[in-house]
A protein has these predicted regions:
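Short S/T/G/P-rich N-terminal loop/turn motif that feeds into the first structured element of a domain
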Residues: 18-68, 72-88, 96-102, 130-132
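Sec-dependent N-terminal signal peptides
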Residues: 5-13
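Surface-exposed, polar helix/loop patches in the mature regions of secreted/periplasmic/lumenal proteins
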Residues: 89-132
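Hydrophobic alpha-helical membrane context
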Residues: 14-16, 109
């Protein structure tokens, strides 16, 4: 009996902590404006290019006063035909407003990142969206 009660308590604590983690993640993502960027490198397998890009991008994101959520990703090993895994890096940022995203475009940290890394990519596609 005692073991069942302890087990139920542990399951309850674990379940409530998982809900809290989900809520924290949801609260950190500002739903007002999302900015998704895909980069295709000229030399996607070049380790030095990747290291340069990652260092510059992390420096930029640490110094951006406008970007809220900051996610950097690489393509997964896609197994479904509908998944485009042709890009080298993805970047997902959220902003409190379209105006904040516009200000981010001209902030110094963003411009320095572009200057440092624009020679690495051959293609960039941006998808912006406003929350509903």
């Amino acid at each position: 009996m005692k073991t069942k009660i302890i087990t139920l308590l542990l399951v309850g604590v674990l379940a409530s902590s998982c809900v809290q983690i989900k809520n924290d993640m949801s609260n950190n993502f500002d739903h007002a404006f999302a900015h998704t960027v895909y980069f295709w490198f000229k030399n996607p397998d070049n380790a030095a290019d990747k290291a340069k890009f990652e260092a510059s991008l992390k420096k930029f994101l640490n110094n951006s006063e406008y970007a809220k959520t900051k996610y950097i990703g690489t393509p997964p090993n896609a197994v479904r035909d509908v998944v485009d895994d042709s890009f080298t890096y993805s970047l997902i940022l959220s902003f409190e407003s379209a105006e904040a995203q516009e200000a981010y475009q001209s902030e110094e940290a963003h411009l320095i990142f572009i200057e440092e890394c624009q020679d690495l990519w051959e293609k960039v596609i941006v998808y912006d969206s406003q929350g509903i």
